[in-house]
Design a protein with these regions (language model features):
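Auxiliary Fe-S-binding modules of radical SAM enzymes
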Residues: 1-110, 167-174, 276-285, 290-375
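A short beta-strand submotif of the Rossmann-like class I SAM-dependent methyltransferase core
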Residues: 50, 141, 186
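Short linear Ser/Thr-Pro motifs
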Residues: 93, 127-128, 222, 247
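Short beta-strand motif preference
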Residues: 100, 112, 124-126, 244-246
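Residue-level structural signal for beta-strand termini and adjacent loop
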Residues: 114-116, 198
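Canonical Radical SAM [4Fe-4S] cluster-binding loop centered on the CxxxCxxC motif
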Residues: 116-164, 168
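Conserved AdoMet/S-adenosylmethionine-binding subsite of the radical SAM
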Residues: 164-353
């Protein structure tokens, strides 16, 4: 087994920075209650008050927590931190998409993308790692290698920094704050299920009615196919709470081994067996993502095989014409080739959506997130 395959299948070491003080934004509501009971005993409702200030109001200073007792605020300020990510740059696409480059406390850069919805609101694509632990050959992030996992607070803070930016823009324009983040997808830098514990906690915070209060049906976690983690996702009932997307990208093990080395460990059959066993909300479907690569996986025979592979999953297929990036060994198929592939998939009885590239002029489209100065 080659070195790239080893990188693709081994869960990375946690690799989280060790803060001088704990960041309370990284605790879910139950954990915050336990922390306060241990360090500042008192009525349990105080933890909910603090949690709301941290995640609903996005407080940057403990002194702003006006309904929390002064003595409690003083203790929290001395024993914990409210550190936040820093927004380095914001790039704007001609289609309204924006790419945020954010800086961590230890100097690393990550990227997050804001995409206008067809209706109202925005979808935010967030990262779970600095770099990525996998080696998918069509993805620019893979060229960075794995640097470290993001802590829970760094995951949720991507949403909060974007929300604060949008609110400030509205205030500067003396307009109503209406450009709200309504959807979140874990499709940025990193493999979310290789950072399972931190992502799981972030989901709890983002969906908490006292926190960010984003409906679980509006959140999707994407994975390249870590079978044990998918099985855990199912056992813990996450499929009932949030959406699951599987990055499939091939219909044979030979091709998937080539474009996604993780397949050398868990073959397509094993992956789909795990997916079929994930209990999901009856109003949702598992999404299968298929990056269309010219001359690699875009043959009509691939479309026919997809019908056989996915027909009994009840899932939907997202076809994503490849988004080029420097050094990539692939090309985007011609539009007629894409259309023929989609039509063949529909003849197989599949529900198919073709994802229109968003933000590709600022390298913000699917598979394009990468950094020249990642450290």
């Amino acid at each position: 087994m080659g070195a790239s395959s080893l990188v693709a299948i081994r869960p990375p070491r946690e690799g989280l920075p060790k803060p001088a003080l704990p960041n309370l934004r990284g605790l879910d509501r139950d954990e915050l209650g336990e922390w306060m009971a241990e360090h500042r005993p008192g009525p349990r409702f105080r933890a909910t008050q603090v949690f709301e200030w941290l995640h609903r109001h996005r407080a940057q200073r403990f002194e702003d927590m006006s309904n929390v007792a002064r003595a409690d605020r003083t203790h929290l300020a001395e024993a914990t931190s409210l550190d936040a990510l820093t927004v380095d740059t914001v790039q704007r696409s001609s289609d309204g998409t924006r790419k945020l480059r954010l800086r961590t406390l230890d100097g690393h850069a990550i990227e997050s993308v804001l995409i206008p919805n067809e209706g109202r609101g925005l979808t935010q694509c967030i990262s779970s790692m600095v770099g990525c632990s996998l080696t998918c050959r069509f993805c620019a992030t893979a060229t960075l290698g794995f640097i470290r996992n993001l802590a829970t607070w760094e995951i949720v803070d991507q949403v909060y920094r974007a929300q604060d930016m949008l609110a400030q823009e509205a205030a500067d324009a003396q307009a109503e704050y209406t450009a709200r983040i309504t959807n979140v997808v874990f499709m940025g830098m990193g493999e979310p299920l290789h950072n399972y514990a931190q992502v799981r906690r972030a989901l709890s915070i983002l969906t908490d009615e006292h926190g960010a209060a984003i409906a679980g049906r509006r959140i999707t976690v994407s994975t390249a196919g870590l079978v044990p983690a998918i099985e855990r996702f199912g056992r813990e009932g996450l499929g009932q709470e949030v959406g699951l997307a599987i990055s499939l990208n091939a219909t044979t093990d030979t091709v998937r081994d080539h474009v996604m080395p993780i397949n050398t460990r868990w073959k397509i059959g094993e992956l789909l067996a795990a997916v079929r066993n994930v209990p999901i909300n009856r109003r949702r479907r598992i999404t299968f993502e298929y990056v269309l690569l010219a001359g690699v996986n875009d043959d009509p025979a691939d479309a026919r095989r997809l019908g056989g592979l996915l027909r009994d999953t009840g899932g939907q297929l997202n076809v994503i014409p490849f988004n080029p990036h420097p050094g990539a060994p692939f090309a985007r198929p011609e539009p007629a080739r894409v259309q023929a592939f989609v039509q063949q998939c529909r003849r197989q009885g599949l529900q198919v959506h073709v994802r229109t590239p968003r933000g590709d002029d600022i390298a913000a489209a699917c598979g394009q997130l990468a950094l020249e100065d990642s450290k």
